[in-house]
Amino acid sequence: MCHFNELSIEIESKNLRSAKKIFHCPYEECGKKYSRPSLLEQHLRTHSNERPFVCDYTGCSKAFYRKSHLKIHKRCHTNVKPFSCHYDGCDAQFYTQQHLERHIEVHRKPKPYACTWEGCDECFSKHQQLRSHISACHTHLLPYPCTYQDCELRFATKQKLQNHVNRAHEKIISYSCPHESCVGHEGFEKWSQLQNHIREAHVPSCSICGRQFKTAAHLRHHVVLHQTTLEERKTYHCPMEGCKKSFTRSSALKKHISVIHEGNMAFHCDSCGTKFGYKHMLQRHLERGTCKKAHKPYINECGIKHDGIEGVAIHDQKEKELSSNLVSDVAKKIINEVTGHGYKEAREYSCSFPECNYRFKRLYDMHRHLNSHH
């Protein structure tokens, strides 16, 4: 039996090499396409300007497209700079490899402007850099004063003055709404303000079927269903000999291998001890009342004995339904177990495909319906 971690790496690399780019960006005039839904999802963030990875440090509201970018950003809070300059006499350190490479270019450029102060060997590629160096390090002059009323601060360079003005005196619009209907909007200072605006003013909706969603991420997952068939979405194939199963997500494939081929049963019934590989199978076991462990029977108000308290609740519910005279037990059973139609209030999950009126109580059941019918 293969080790699970090694097998996961093998699965990932194998599918990356063989996968076809079948997931197309739904935005007009964008011809991007990808081999996996996750890559398409990552790309779509550049259209919606969605940055789900938010820094959780107190007072910091910066957000990023990718988790790796957030990880790099957090180094500025911990002051971890793993990339160091290798030039002799230079102790500069940086948060990223890109910043280090940019710094190294400074060493490689010619530096014709040398400081003439006694004992100073600094050289610079620009004359303005030399002037700023002399003001800050030798004459200690601060030639750039803040011109705002009641502010007496001065700075050695124009850039430091501008940074001060932006931070202390002027409202900086860092984020603007990407939707065309918001052209001319003044924008937002914080990422969180932009996200609140988008949630309230621009509810994500499918351009194909018109269905609305709570988040852009839910919409992206939905769009993929319109663009491909189920078989096209199943790009993750089980590598175990004799197994022809395939899946739409790598996580589903890993779970399949863990449960079916390695026999890992993480969920068990507290009453009878029966083990299950999937949580929904345990839930179904509990809902159906198939637990065979002997226990004291429960008696309801009608004097009827039941194997468990769940049986009492089911009986009482049936009595209530009969008294309401809405539908017969036979009709209810057909509706509940066969058609999936009706009882809109109790079935919050509806099929998103046009002309399909199926509704479901559980999200899991809706996914099974989509995979088998669409």
Swiss-Prot record:
Q: Which one GO biological process term can you cite for this protein?
A: transcription initiation at RNA polymerase III promoter
User: Where the protein is mainly located, per its record?
Assistant: nucleus
The keyword RNA-binding is assigned to this record: yes
The cross-references to PANTHER family, in alphabetical order and at most eight, read:
C2H2-TYPE DOMAIN-CONTAINING PROTEIN, ZINC FINGER PROTEIN
- Supply one GO CC term from the record: nucleus
Q: Where in the cell is it found?
A: Nucleus
- Segments forming C2H2-type zinc fingers: 23-47, 53-77, 83-107, 113-138, 144-169, 204-226, 236-261, 267-291, 349-374
| Keyword line | DNA-binding, Metal-binding, Nucleus, Repeat, RNA-binding, Transcription, Transcription regulation, Zinc, Zinc-finger
Q: What is this protein called?
A: Transcription factor IIIA
Q: Which organism is it from?
A: Schizosaccharomyces pombe (strain 972 / ATCC 24843)
Asked if Signal is a keyword of the record, the answer is: no
What is the purpose of this protein?
Is required for correct transcription of 5S RNA genes by RNA polymerase III. Also binds the transcribed 5S RNA's. Initiates transcription of the 5S ribosomal RNA gene.
> InterPro entries annotated for this entry?
Zinc_finger_trans_reg, Znf_C2H2_sf, Znf_C2H2_type
**By its UniProt entry, which Pfam families does this protein fall under?**
zf-C2H2
* Gene designation: sfc2
One MF annotation (Gene Ontology) recorded for this entry: zinc ion binding
